């Protein structure tokens, strides 16, 4: 099947697979939100949160109008008016970022397949990688690609993977732990003299409105990032 400058097919799992762009063979491998994979062949491709691809998905700006291929072959028009956070880990490379997102209702979501091409005008700009429920009849559809100018993205080597932990109410975050605010400073000071040869770790703390990422040696915090949420969560993994 063809649309604009792409050729695509539907695989046995009912997902859309982009086969060619501008008559050049394409590779697009979609990852579950938070998924960790070990496959050295994937390292040769571009990576954006939720996807490994031979295609460079361009930078978009908030409020861009996009068109998404629906299951009946028509194009659904949506607006990038929200943001969300997604990540994956590929060969110990932690790829993460805030992504522009469109809001869809239940009826629209049922018309969309994972892998469906996303266009701005007639140009391919991304693919459908996930959905995130934010209300009874409201979902976020993230649009992955080069970082939107006002958002944050990044990647880092994580030798021991990424631990994901729900950020509990009335807690503050330092390193690998969350504690009440009146205890967190003392805990941080106690880590100053700990051994620098301790095990490295990366922890992602999340709540609906905010994401924290820490990189640590033992309980000593080396880096601490703050970003807006929500975290796109897979249906098959429970984050404690």
Curated annotation (Swiss-Prot):
<dbReference type="GO" id="GO:0061507">
    <property type="term" value="F:2',3'-cyclic GMP-AMP binding"/>
</dbReference>
<feature type="active site" description="Proton acceptor; shared with catalytic histidine of dimeric partner">
    <location>
        <position position="185"/>
    </location>
</feature>
<feature type="site" description="Substrate binding">
    <location>
        <position position="93"/>
    </location>
</feature>
<feature type="active site" description="Proton donor">
    <location>
        <position position="46"/>
    </location>
</feature>
<dbReference type="Pfam" id="PF04766">
    <property type="entry name" value="Baculo_p26"/>
</dbReference>
<dbReference type="InterPro" id="IPR006853">
    <property type="entry name" value="Poxin_vir"/>
</dbReference>
<keyword id="KW-0378">Hydrolase</keyword>
<feature type="active site" description="Shared with catalytic histidine of dimeric partner">
    <location>
        <position position="181"/>
    </location>
</feature>
<dbReference type="GO" id="GO:0004518">
    <property type="term" value="F:nuclease activity"/>
</dbReference>
<comment type="subunit">
    <text>Homodimer.</text>
</comment>
<keyword id="KW-0540">Nuclease</keyword>
<comment type="function">
    <text>Nuclease that cleaves host 2',3'-cGAMP.</text>
</comment>
<comment type="similarity">
    <text>Belongs to the poxin family.</text>
</comment>
<feature type="site" description="Substrate binding">
    <location>
        <position position="146"/>
    </location>
</feature>
<protein>
    <recommendedName>
        <fullName>Poxin</fullName>
        <ecNumber>3.1.-.-</ecNumber>
    </recommendedName>
</protein>
<feature type="site" description="Substrate binding">
    <location>
        <position position="226"/>
    </location>
</feature>
């Amino acid at each position: 099947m063809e649309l604009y400058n792409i050729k695509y097919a539907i695989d046995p799992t009912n997902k859309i697979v982009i086969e060619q762009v501008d008559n050049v063979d394409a590779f697009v491998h979609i990852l579950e939100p938070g998924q960790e994979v070990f496959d050295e062949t994937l390292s040769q491709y571009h990576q954006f949160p939720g996807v490994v691809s031979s295609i460079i998905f361009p930078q978009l700006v908030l409020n861009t109008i996009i068109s998404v291929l629906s299951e009946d072959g028509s194009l659904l028009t949506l607006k990038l008016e929200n943001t969300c956070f997604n990540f994956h880990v590929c060969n110990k490379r932690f790829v993460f970022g805030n992504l522009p997102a469109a809001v869809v209702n239940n009826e629209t979501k049922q018309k969309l397949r994972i892998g469906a091409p996303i266009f701005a005008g007639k140009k391919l700009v991304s693919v459908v990688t996930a959905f995130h429920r934010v209300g009874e009849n409201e979902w976020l559809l993230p649009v992955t690609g080069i970082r939107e100018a006002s958002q944050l993205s990044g990647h880092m080597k994580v030798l021991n993977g990424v631990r994901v932990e729900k950020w509990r109410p009335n807690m503050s975050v330092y390193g690998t732990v969350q504690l009440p605010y009146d205890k967190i400073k003392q805990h941080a000071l106690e880590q100053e003299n700990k051994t620098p040869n301790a095990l490295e770790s990366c922890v992602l703390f999340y709540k609906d409105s905010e994401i924290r990422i820490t990189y640590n040696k033992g309980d000593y915090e080396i880096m601490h990032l703050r970003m807006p949420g929500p975290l796109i969560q897979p249906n098959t993994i429970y984050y404690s």
